[in-house]
From Swiss-Prot:
Localisation per UniProt entry: Nucleus
Protein's GO biological process: cell division; chromosome segregation; protein sumoylation
Alphabetized CDD domains for the sequence: UBCc_UBE2I
InterPro entries, per database record: Ub_conjugating_enzyme, UBQ-conjugat_E2_core, UBQ-conjugating_AS, UBQ-conjugating_enzyme/RWD
A GO CC term attached to the entry: nucleus
Subunit structure: Forms a tight complex with RANGAP1 and RANBP2.
Site, as annotated: Substrate binding: D100, K101
The enzyme's E.C. designation: 2.3.2.-
Taxonomy of the source species: Eukaryota, Metazoa, Chordata, Craniata, Vertebrata
Protein name: SUMO-conjugating enzyme UBC9
Interaction with sumo1: annotated span: 13-18
Primary localization class, coarse: nucleus
Amino acid sequence: MSGIALSRLAQERKAWRKDHPLGLVAVPTKNPDGTMNLMNGECAIPGKKGTPWEGGLFKLRMLFKDDYPSSPPKCKFEPPLFHPNVYPSGTVCLSILEEDKDWRPAITIKQILLGIQELLNEPNIQDPAQAEAYTIFCQDRTEYEKRVRAQAKKFSPS
């Protein structure tokens, strides 16, 4: 494991514990021996108020490579979501998560989670990752929002 990656992740965890957006969750997983695994984060993103996503809490895994922050983490909804920019595997398609697009080492976990939260209600139709969600979003917005509301209800924490 890279000392640079672990150092950066420890720094980010410390900053996150002091101040993070309401409702967002980001915690490292635990190794079999009980120690923290900073390279594997369990996250949760609440749907924004006033959107069809409201009420849902969507679980996401954030996996960091040894060369983080030179390369972005892989972000994957577990289970996968119905969304134009989420691959059927659950992996999020977002330009700031792609090394050859908009990733920069200065981008933080907080910025990534806020970016994904924003993406939920504002899909990028120029970069679709899921054919069914993309097609319904483009052709029948009412049906799309109905499905999103049902999904938010399904993933409601209460």
